[in-house]
A protein has these predicted regions:
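Short polar catalytic/cofactor-binding loops
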Residues: 43-47, 176
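Hydrophobic helical h-region of N-terminal Sec-dependent signal peptides
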Residues: 9-14
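N-terminal glycine/threonine-rich, aromatic-flanked beta-hairpin/loop signature
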Residues: 38, 46-131
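Edge beta-strand at a domain terminus
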Residues: 81-98, 137-199
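N-terminal helix-cap/turn-to-beta initiation motif at the start of protein domains
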Residues: 24-40, 56
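Short, hydrophobic/aromatic-rich segments at coil-to-beta transitions
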Residues: 33-41, 63, 99-104, 143-148, ...
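Bacterial N-terminal signal peptides that target proteins for export
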Residues: 1-8
Length: 199
């Protein structure tokens, strides 16, 4: 159980990989049409402490959805939970810190969680995530309550992030240790080493 909770903390630092912004200007390196499509982890991603994830993004020119699946094994076969996050996004301006990257704000419109094992269903229940009874394999909305290390949207409605596209690879900003990208001054100054790949 401690491993699962550590995994939740580690995954929360990646869960967004996303944020909200204003109209796209013609001089930005990344444009909404560059982001539109389906992007997924090319492999089972290690996030340390024997914790693993796969990220699956679906973006239009103004909305984003992330299905983040956490696993208990290096082959990404043993599912622990899925976090589904969705909302609007806008691109702001080119990053001064990272050449070729564009600042983006990704809004947290909705948050849903699905436990895939009973200990996590119990943990979600004990943490008062959502408003119903947690059952393995059943998704529940947690937008207002948050869930363990995922904040309610009222506490953090937007991630201030970076995006960069290189061929069929999409990079987001490197999330800070405290997972706080809720204000413009918290925007990353570097890209994550692990991209997602266009499908």
């Amino acid at each position: 159980m401690k491993t699962s909770l550590r995994l939740l903390a580690a995954v929360a630092t990646l869960s967004a990989a996303c944020a909200t912004t204003s109209a796209q200007g013609p001089k930005t390196a990344v444009k909404p049409q560059d982001l539109a499509g389906t992007w997924s982890s090319p492999t089972c991603e290690s996030i340390g402490n024997n914790n693993y994830i796969q990220r699956h993004f679906t973006l239009t020119e103004n909305t984003w959805t992330l299905n983040l699946v956490a696993f208990g094994d290096a082959q990404c076969q043993a599912k622990l939970f899925t976090a589904r996050i969705q909302g609007p996004y806008t691109l702001v301006k080119d990053s001064e810190a990272v050449p070729g990257a564009t600042e983006g704000n990704f809004g947290f419109g909705e948050l849903y969680m699905t436990p895939h094992m009973q200990p996590l269903a119990d943990a979600f229940q004990n943490a008062k995530c959502g408003s119903g009874t947690w059952k393995v394999g059943e998704e529940q909305r947690t937008t207002e309550t948050g869930c363990l290390f995922f904040r309610p949207t009222s506490a953090c409605g937007t991630d201030h992030d970076l995006v960069k596209v290189e061929g069929n690879q999409l990079f987001f900003g490197q999330r800070p240790a405290d997972n706080d990208m809720c204000a413009p001054e918290k925007r990353p100054a570097a890209l994550t080493a692990l991209p997602v790949v266009k499908r």
